[in-house]
Amino acid sequence: MIDSSLPLTDIHRHLDGNIRAQTILDLGREFNIALPASTLDTLRPHVQVTSLEPDLVSFLAKLDWGVKVLASLEACRRVAYENVEDAARNGLHYVELRFSPRYMAMTHQLPVDGVVEAVIAGVREGSRDFQVDARLIGILSRTFGEAACQEELAALLAHREGITALDLAGDELGFPGALFLNHFNQARDAGWHITVHAGEAAGPESIWQAIRELGAERIGHGVKAVEDPALMDYLAEHQIGIESCLTSNVQTSTVASLAQHPLKQFLEHGVLASLNTDDPAVQGVDIIHEYTVAAPAAGLSREQIRQAQINGLTQAFLSEQEKAALIQRVAKG
C-alpha cells in the first residue's frame, strides 16, 4: 500500500513517546531507577500497548515510563538519536519529531534548556548517520499552565535554529488555546511553522481557535472536524492539513474503531490529511502498519492511501525546493 516511488513521511511523531523498551531498561539499570519489571519481555506490557481494548489511562501510564528514566542530558541525546535510527528502520525518508522539553526534564529536574540542546544534537547526529531528513517541533505542554509554557518556549527559542515549528499539546478542554496567544505570536515572530493538537478531546471550536488565534497551518488529530461542515470546507479550501494517527486514536478512545475514523471523510472532502504514527513505541506499531493494516481497516482505498502519502509531503514543513530535492532523491533510489 506504500508507493515506493514517493517519499514516505511521518509528520506527527512524538520523540518522547517513542523511547524503546530496551532503552528504558538500560537507563533504569544505569541510574538505579525502580522499574515495574527487570527483563525486556516482562517490561514490555508496562511500556507498550498489548491489549486491543482502548484505555486512555493505561496508555498515558505507559507513555510516562519513557521519560521517568531520562536522568541525564546524555540520556535525552540517546533517545533523540535512536528516534532517527527507528525512522530509518521504518523506511521513512522524512520525519518531524516533536517533543516537550519540560515533560522530558521534569522527573529528574533536568535543565529544560539543556534538554533542548541534547535533543537537537541527537537528531542531528542521527540524521547524519542514517540519512534521514529529520526536523524538530517543540511542544508546549499546556497542562503545565501559561507561565511554565513561557519558560518552555524560552528554552526552545534559545535554540531556534534547531527547531522548525511549535505545537501545543495536552488537556485542550482545561487549557484552551486562548491562554497561549502570546506564546504563539512569539513563535511566528521567530519564523516557525505552527501545528496544534486540537479537535481530539474538544470539539470543532478548538480547531477553529487553533487556526484563527494561534495561526495553525496543520492540526494534530482533528477528528472532531467532521462535526462542522463549514470547518471541513475551510480546511480543504485553505489547505490546512490534518495529521491523522489511526491506531493511536483507537488506543486512546478518541474514536471507537478504525472503521469509524474520519480519515476517509477528510480525504473525500479534499482535506489534506496524512497518515502518521503518534507514539510508535508505546503503541507497538510503525508507519508501515498504519499504511498496510490500519488504513485499509479504516476503509481507505488504494488511491486514498496514496493520496494520504502525497499529503504527508505536501504538508511537510519544508520549502518547495526541499520537497523537490526529496522527491528527486527517492526517485534515484
UniProtKB/Swiss-Prot annotation:
Protein name: Adenosine deaminase
Top EC class for this record: hydrolase
Site positions (Important for catalytic activity): H221
Gene Ontology CC terms: cytosol
Residues engaged in binding substrate: H14, D16, G170, D279
UniProt-listed PANTHER family: ADENOSINE DEAMINASE (PTHR11409:SF43)
Recorded superkingdom: Bacteria
UniProt cross-references to InterPro entries, sorted A to Z: A/AMP_deam_AS, A_deaminase, A_deaminase_dom, Ado/ade_deaminase, Metal_Hydrolase
GO MF, any single term: 2'-deoxyadenosine deaminase activity
Family designation: Belongs to the metallo-dependent hydrolases superfamily. Adenosine and AMP deaminases family. Adenosine deaminase subfamily.
One GO biological process term: inosine biosynthetic process
Disulfide feature: none
Job description of the protein: Catalyzes the hydrolytic deamination of adenosine and 2-deoxyadenosine.
Keywords: Hydrolase, Metal-binding, Nucleotide metabolism, Zinc
Residues annotated for Zn(2+) binding in this entry: H12, H14, H197, D278
Active site: E200 (proton donor)
